[in-house]
Design a protein with these regions (language model features):
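Conserved N-terminal Rossmann-fold NAD(P)-binding element of oxidoreductases
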Residues: 31, 174-176
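Phosphate/diphosphate ligand-binding glycine-rich loop within oxidoreductases
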Residues: 70-151, 165
Length: 348
């Protein structure tokens, strides 16, 4: 039994915890350089160890960080597989990922070890959708080819048959993954006169379908055979690895284009390169690659592709917003509450 003074002291501690008063400054290790404004705020709030040189950690350095930190802030370049996570120290309680995708983290092993995982959803949506739409335009209209002609001094003047591309207005766009980003892509594409088709685990709410005038395809194979442009906007999970397999790529029209701003592993990159080289697909716009930072050498030689170095969400605004979400997740954890963006294995 607690005496009256002890009960009062206990109640005060509980109220303080519920009000969000920090119990302490957790030791936070950040694996990559973040925007200055984000790092400044993190130093104010936490015992923060930064990476000012922005050199990716080796696997040994990453394991050492897991052993030392109470909170680890990794990015997509850090491979936190089960072998790494089982070596985490007893004080590690939170992996606050700087990014929406968590396919580089073994979330289930983290859960088994009592380590929460959070991400930064929502704040990358519009910027990634912008880049997707840019690629949807750039590939059929041969924009990069045209820029190279100018830079190489090969432009000799306009002619009626010069640099002819393909019209996108009125074409069918097939979106694979109709989450936040997929829907944002659909809104942009609809404004450009594209017909919206999509494949998802389940149909989106009817109000969204009506707004986008979108057609749902339960069968991915059937949709791929009928659309003119495919946009990959689904996460990489064990179920979506090589979702666009050689067989499915061959089911597409030879005049079709494919755009990927999601994860490279969703497409069989070798099969895609072979088909583009053989003229079995019209072109591709890729911001992500199966073995980043390596890119299939065949893709680098092709004229009918636009390749970008994983910059779909790369705006200053999105990076600051992502940092703010990381800070909120850490601060909420430090205050003894459930982080708002916690990733549950069943969600993946």
């Amino acid at each position: 039994m607690l005496c009256g003074a002890a009960r009062l002291c206990y109640r005060r501690r509980v109220r303080s915890r519920r009000r969000g008063h920090p119990l302490k400054k957790p030791l936070v290790i950040v694996t990559r350089k973040l925007p200055d404004i984000v790092e400044t705020r993190m130093r104010e709030l936490f015992d923060t160890r930064l990476n000012p040189d922005d050199k990716p950690m080796t696997q040994a350095q990453l394991v050492e960080a897991l052993k030392t930190a109470e909170v680890l802030v990794p990015t997509v370049t850090d491979r936190l597989d089960s072998r790494a996570i089982v070596q985490a120290g007893p004080n590690l309680k939170l992996i606050a990922n700087f990014g929406a995708g968590v396919d580089h983290i073994d979330v289930e092993t983290a859960r088994q070890r009592g380590i929460a995982v959070t991400n930064t959803p929502g704040v990358l949506t519009e910027d990634t959708a912008d880049m997707t739409m840019a690629l949807i335009l750039a590939v059929p209209r041969r924009m990069v080819e045209g820029a190279e002609v100018l830079m190489n001094g090969d432009f000799k003047g306009w002619s009626p048959t010069w640099m002819l591309g393909k019209r996108i207005w009125g074409k069918r766009l097939g979106i694979v993954g109709m989450g936040r980003i997929g829907q944002a892509v659909a809104r942009r594409a609809k404004a450009f006169g594209l017909q919206i088709h999509y494949h998802n685990r389940k149909p989106v709410p009817q109000a969204i379908e009506q707004e986008l005038e979108a057609t749902y395809w339960e069968s991915l194979d059937q949709m791929l055979a009928r659309v003119d442009i495919v946009s990959i906007n689904c996460p990489h999970t064990p179920a979506t690895y090589h979702l666009l397999s050689a067989r499915r790529l061959k089911a597409m029209k030879p005049t079709a284009y494919i755009v990927n701003t999601a994860r490279g592993e969703v497409i069989d990159e070798n099969a895609l390169a072979r088909m583009l080289e053989a003229g079995e697909l019209a072109g591709a716009g890729l911001d992500v690659f199966e073995h980043e930072p390596a890119v299939n050498p065949k893709l680098l030689k092709l004229k009918n592709v636009v390749l970008l170095p994983h910059m779909g969400s790369a705006t200053l605004e999105s990076r600051i917003d992502m940092g703010e979400k990381v800070i909120v997740n850490i601060k909420t954890y430090a205050d003894g509450h459930r982080p708002p963006d916690r990733v549950i294995p069943a969600m993946l």
